[in-house]
Amino acid sequence: MLEVKNLHAKIGEKEILKGIDLVINDGETHAIMGPNGSGKSTLSAVLVGNPLYEVTEGEVYFNGKNLLEMKPEDRAHEGLFLSFQYPVEIPGVSMTNFMKAAINEKRKYLGLEPMNAAEFLQLQREKRKIVELDSKLANRSVNEGFSGGEKKRNEIFQMAMLEPKLSILDETDSGLDVDAMRIVADGVNKLQTPETSCIVITHYDRLLEMIRPQFVHVLYKGRIVKTGGPELAKEIQEHGYDWIKEEIGEE
């Protein structure tokens, strides 16, 4: 599904990604952990095409297509989804209109007919149940006046509606209490299929206990320096990153 080869990227004159190699197959969940400033959020931003970042070297293929040649909106239409660490508010734009426009833009890109109102409302009802989203939230402006937990739940609802092939959750657990985290994790788990994959970027293993990735990668100074299974997240939670720095020859 996703193949990243020797990816280098910078913002301004500062190089942040310094040779990322990563392969994600259909149906896999990968977690990316690492100290602050290691490049985790930069990687997600580069994958979705944030224009603030410049790719200076490397290749990225998404389902066999050159991702780096695509516009950000085309990456989304191809099935890439990013859940932001800090979701933005869009006053005056209702969730219903926002989601209907997003879905029909994707359908247009794929050569499909627009979804009519009845089909859309039925889909909205089905997906709202999955993430336990209050119908009142679905009728308000996008994220306006939402609590932190409501914003995150709303993003998982958007993910459910858009049915992406690869979802990137960038510190979705940031600021969530355990109950809200469980609802987010349950939603993500229910949406996983053998054809869809997920990247979970996090500092903590609590979310990973609920989502359970098959692979855990440690990003440090712009490179993936260690890969393991769920047990790696446990070791990091208990012992921090110093032992990994020692392992790769850094103090």
Annotate the PLM regions.
Residues 215, 219, 223-246:
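Conserved beta-strand-loop-alpha-helix hinge in the C-terminal portion
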Residues 2-4, 17-19:
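Conserved structural motif at the start of ABC-family nucleotide-binding domains
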Residues 159-160:
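ABC ATPase C-loop
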Residues 82-86, 92-108, 120-123:
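Q-loop/switch helix immediately C-terminal to the Walker
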